A protein has these predicted regions:
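Beta1/beta-strand and adjacent pyrophosphate-binding region of the FAD-binding site
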Residues: 32-46, 62
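Conserved N-terminal/central alpha/beta ligand/cofactor-binding core
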Residues: 59-60, 66-177, 183, 227, ...
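Helical element adjacent to the flavin cofactor pocket in flavoenzyme catalytic cores
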Residues: 155-213, 256, 260-262
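A glycine-rich dinucleotide-binding beta-alpha-beta segment and adjacent secondary-structure elements
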Residues: 186, 385-470
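Glycine-rich loop(s) and the adjacent beta-strand/alpha-helix scaffold that form part
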Residues: 203-206, 210-279, 477-492, 496
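Helix-rich C-terminal "cap"/substrate-channel and partner-interaction subdomain
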Residues: 329-424, 496, 500, 512-516
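Sequence context of c-type cytochrome heme-c attachment sites
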Residues: 511-571
Length: 579
């Protein structure tokens, strides 16, 4: 059986029952009966896609999210690799599914043939058109090393501008209910079928069993669990000694544990996307979180003081070069002019400059010296190697050719590539930074989780990064090949689960407890309370930037927990204050 496109008459079936939309903070559901037709675990881009699609198929949907807001890591992510879109045609870019299919195989070596073909064929109607119909505005298309033609689509800014319209549509959907600040602790199984989940409310500790005939796991990757990352490192003999967490806060691998317990065939768990320019987050007391540092004006030196790669090479070439280093880290070297190009990709837009200056001014993270001799002393780099590398670089700038690694040539040199000769000089040591998972429970063409014989596990579906985005990346992650496939796999899972709902399905009415109506301004200093991670992040920024409350809190968004649909929609209007 071949999967059909997600558009058209397949979704003629509509919902017959509407429910009151509210934010669930602490629920008193009993363990009997059915609470939804479909439970979606995770409100990231895959989970939201699944929820919207299941609702379109007529199902009552309950989305369980550990955070107090939706979006997952996508709110800080970038663009979408999309094929033969209206925007490409408007810009005169000729693309086709066949060309994209060949590109993905050339780059990834062995992506999943079925899902790769499905994605390149349907990314335009089922991702681009679907999102633009919600109000998403793609404006920019970038070229990338993976693609024969430009197909890396961006809005004006990060993918938060995709998440906001998706969340708004979900909040307005009478078939979709959200349960925030709630962590799934295990799957519920009865007579061989997954029948729901067990949960705990992160704020008050209350425990609940939620029942549904179908459960979709869209819990994200495991890159925020360093033990899982190391246990699944591709080369067990060469695991980095120092490794920093660079994924979303809640990418802790829970979904992998759930599906493994359910009997899933776990595939390609060693396929991970690692960035190799991570610096410790100076604001992380655990010293485990990292930030992605960038400086196109810098040269990169290994521990011997020598350059080892073209700093402008593609991600595969850089990964191969850094993996050969012992230890697996290197130094960014730049001068005063070059320091202006330094940036932190992971920082919230509102405090980019503050965090950047904090890192440059922290002697534990950045060595600063008026001479190269002093810089060598501070860093432990060999003085001769450091001085020789800088002198060689400056001579190549004068000549106009990088004869060592071909980073530039006459007529082909970016303006920021210049001599390093204006003190003070800077040296910043960078390390591997975890990012994305490309393996996970195997799924079939309906996004059902399958065992090692290919037999579906009844009632269980997976989507997004948890499912390795269906193997579309093969061995090497590409630009935009996570967000788009997350939408596709989420929609397929939602459609399949929604259409599997029995015609006589009956769900229990929701009975949310009274919500906390305290003025949160009075409790703002109480950071670190369980279940308030997002609140903490936002309000730390408020204090840091000396914002006033009315920057975000208007009449539709009072200074308390948002507990009505209108309030939650109003909160969406504040997302871009930070992102």
């Amino acid at each position: 059986m071949q999967l059909q496109p997600l558009t058209g008459s397949l979704f003629a079936r509509t919902a017959s029952v509407a429910c009151l939309l509210t934010t669930l903070v602490s629920c008193t559901f009993n363990s009997g009966g059915q609470h939804a037709d479909v439970i979606v675990v995770g409100a990231g881009i895959a989970g939201l896609s699944a929820a919207l699609e299941a609702s379109a198929a007529g199902a009552r949907v309950l989305v369980v999210e550990q955070n107090s807001v939706g979006g997952g890591h996508a709110v800080k992510a970038g663009g979408f690799a999309l094929v033969d879109t209206a925007l490409q045609r408007d810009k005169g870019i000729e693309d086709s599914p066949n060309l994209a299919y060949r590109d993905l195989f050339r780059w990834g070596k062995d992506p999943d043939p079925y899902w790769t073909r499905y994605y390149v064929t349907h990314s335009a109607p089922d991702v681009y058109d679907w999102l633009t119909d919600m109000g998403v505005q793609f404006k920019v298309i970038l070229d990338t090393p993976e693609s024969s033609v430009p197909r890396f689509h961006f809005t004006r800014g990060t993918a938060v501008n995709v998440i906001i319209p998706m969340l708004r549509k979900a909040l307005l959907d009478p078939n979709i209910e959200f349960m925030w600040n709630t962590r799934v602790t295990e799957l519920a199984r009865s007579r061989g079928r997954i029948k729901g989940v067990f949960t705990v409310n992160e704020r008050d500790g209350s425990k609940t069993r939620l029942n549904a005939p179908s459960t979709i796991l869209a819990t994200g990757g495991f890159q925020n669990d360093l033990k899982m990352v190391r246990d699944n490192w591709p080369d067990k003999t060469d695991v980095p000694g120092q490794l920093y967490k660079g994924a979303g806060k809640f990418a802790t691998g829970d979904g992998y544990n759930f599906t493994r317990w359910a009997g899933a065939d776990m595939r390609n768990m060693d396929r991970q996307v690692t960035f190799y320019s991570g610096v410790p987050d100076p604001r992380d007391p655990s010293a485990g979180k990292g930030l992605y540092a960038e400086n196109p004006a810098a040269i990169w030196l290994a521990s011997n003081g020598r350059r080892f790669v073209n700093e402008s090479a593609n991600s595969k070439q850089i990964a191969a070069a850094v993996s050969e280093l012992k230890p697996m880290s290197y130094w960014l070297i730049f001068d005063t002019k070059g320091s202006r190009r330094f940036s932190i990709r992971d920082a919230l837009a509102a405090n980019q400059q503050t965090l950047r200056d904090e890192i440059l001014g922290d002697p534990e993270l950045t060595a600063t010296a008026d001479t190269l001799v002093e810089l060598a002393r501070q860093t432990g780099l060999p003085e001769h190697g450091l001085k020789t590398s800088i002198e060689t670089w400056n001579r190549m700038i004068d000549v106009g050719t990088d004869f060592k690694f071909k980073r530039f040539s006459p007529g082909n040199r970016a303006t920021y590539i210049r001599a390093i000769n204006e003190p003070p000089f800077f040296a910043m040591r960078v390390y591997p930074l975890t990012r994305k998972s490309m393996g996970g429970p195997a799924i079939n063409i309906h996004a059902q989780v399958v065992d090692d014989s290919g037999v579906p596990i009844p009632g269980l579906y997976a989507a997004g990064e948890l499912a390795g985005v269906a193997g579309i990346n093969g061995q090497h992650g590409g630009s935009g090949t996570f967000l788009g496939p997350s939408v596709i796999t989420g929609r397929v899972a939602g459609r399949s689960a929604g259409l599997a709902t029995p015609a006589d399905s009956v769900t229990l009415p929701y009975k949310p407890d009274e919500h906390d109506s305290r003025d949160l301004a009075a409790t703002a200093p109480d950071f670190g309370l369980p279940g308030y991670w997002h609140y903490d992040q936002v309000h730390r920024l408020v204090f840091e930037q000396a914002y006033t409350c009315d920057l975000c809190h208007v009449s539709d968004l009072p200074k308390r927990l948002a507990n009505k649909s209108a309030e939650m929609q109003a909160r969406l209007n504040t997302c871009t204050r930070c992102h």
